[in-house]
Amino acid sequence: MRVSLRSITSLLAAATAAVLAAPATETLDRRAALPNPYDDPFYTTPSNIGTFAKGQVIQSRKVPTDIGNANNAASFQLQYRTTNTQNEAVADVATVWIPAKPASPPKIFSYQVYEDATALDCAPSYSYLTGLDQPNKVTAVLDTPIIIGWALQQGYYVVSSDHEGFKAAFIAGYEEGMAILDGIRALKNYQNLPSDSKVALEGYSGGAHATVWATSLADSYAPELNIVGASHGGTPVSAKDTFTFLNGGPFAGFALAGVSGLSLAHPDMESFIEARLNAKGQQTLKQIRGRGFCLPQVVLTYPFLNVFSLVNDTNLLNEAPIAGILKQETVVQAEASYTVSVPKFPRFIWHAIPDEIVPYQPAATYVKEQCAKGANINFSPYPIAEHLTAEIFGLVPSLWFIKQAFDGTTPKVICGTPIPAIAGITTPSADQVLGSDLANQLRSLNGKQSAFGKPFGPITPP
């Protein structure tokens, strides 16, 4: 599909207008309920961070959000201790929702929303707050309320970490994965949940990247967590492959955001790139890291940008330290400089074969490699979808899989067998899985503009 600059601009404008119109089911104030994270001490790592254990809650506060109100859920922000890429103790923030009627025994649902930007005020915890002026609000008002609302209907405790951390290190796998695992620990600590509480994870696109890294690091970083399943779709499994796929194309802003995010997580990469930036590159890197420069701006500002035009060295990907970092920031074994782990719990992975934002082939390679090492993966490639339609196609089947994982009833499959999961055909329908109210909300997304500057749909879920 050919995408023009004019079409991207018009779609982003429509997406912004859709957010400002606000969901019909909620009454939202224009201003966020709390200060911008840049002005909020809650987003500052305390000087004694090293005295806290991983996942220990440092401070907490009750917050109003636009999500979970129909379920009478209580929402809180937790500041907790986690670990960065350099294995240093740092603080992070997670939003948690406490169900009005918790399932017994307790179950924990970890949801990773796509943030896809490198500014602190793009963080999910800020976007979730009641209000309309948050710069990344569009990521929190479309399918996200449906997913979290469904989990609360089941009585699951919900945690959604700011997986990019206070540095907003987009696409930095270690940083994201550890932040998520410690966010789950923080929720368990905050609610005094049993040590063996079942945990499941879900994410799409940038949120899927965070999810796959959490699943990959779980066995070594948080082996005590009782993870029973994970679903993720449109997953960027390789930083290098995703960058190469995006650079120079209509969604080149994500390639630039990835360079910015990885550099924020790897100081040696930051120093290396800074020394090679030309004048345009210096200005552009400062811009993408600027306050309020979030997913819509990333997409709108840089279509067809060649990131190499910002530096005086076009061989960066093959030079140290970047070449070595890219071999670390991948879960594809054929590219990795380390042994990629194989999670033991069942997973549901879906992807559009003609995906125009996240390349399909690396994800398929990851599934093949994992299956060869004994993984349990339900693989659902969609041959006639693209990034946004696949997001909707996989939503109901992925949540159904999560419920099965919690119930211990995931289907036995030959790992990696490509079988498209279709709600109402191969899985229960949207009404059966979500209930009629949430199913109708999902159908209402058909044709609405997404945060990616493209519409959901056009196919309405059954």
UniProtKB/Swiss-Prot annotation:
Uppermost EC category: hydrolase
InterPro entries hit by this protein: AB_hydrolase_fold, Lipase_secreted
GO cellular component: extracellular region
Source superkingdom: Eukaryota
Keywords attached to this entry: Disulfide bond, Hydrolase, Lipid degradation, Lipid metabolism, Secreted, Signal
Temperature section of the record: Optimum temperature is 40-70 degrees Celsius.
Family: Belongs to the AB hydrolase superfamily. Lipase family.
Annotated function: Hydrolyzes triglycerides, with a preference for substrates with short-chain lengths (C4 to C8). Has the highest activity with tributyrin (C4), followed by tricaproin (C6) and tricaprylin (C8). Can also hydrolyze vinylacetate (C2) and triolein (C18), but with lower efficiency. Has no activity with tripalmitin (C16).
Listed name of the protein: Lipase A
